[in-house]
Amino acid sequence: MRPAAAAVIDVCCVIAFVAIGRASHHHGESIGGLASTAWPFLTGLGVGLVVTRAWRRPAVIVPAGLGAWLGTVAVGMLLRVVAGQGTALAFIGVALAFLGLFLLGWRAVVAGHARWRAATRSRR
């Protein structure tokens, strides 16, 4: 998988997390509001991807997926504190669960599909 495609999927996962969270708390649906909530997490995603050099193997769970997940949550929450946006303990738990499921999940699906294709080819 190309690094740019993986990055787009990761960004979509983070935007989905933010959009669902904003909708569940009845915040406005403005682009500005979405951007205001998303920037700490998108910055964290970028940090996690750079630290793990995810462009080398962007679709693997370790290190790329793990770096994306933990970077998004850890750096994102830290930046939310610095920006005065708040980080309730329950919010951290929800972020860990949702982003873990999505940022690691799509990579698990890609890995499973690759194993299935390899097994199918070896049976021919």
Give the location of each predicted region.
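Alpha-helical transmembrane segments of polytopic membrane proteins
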Residues: 33-42, 91-101
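Loop-to-helix transition at the N-terminal end of transmembrane alpha-helices
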Residues: 28-47, 63-66
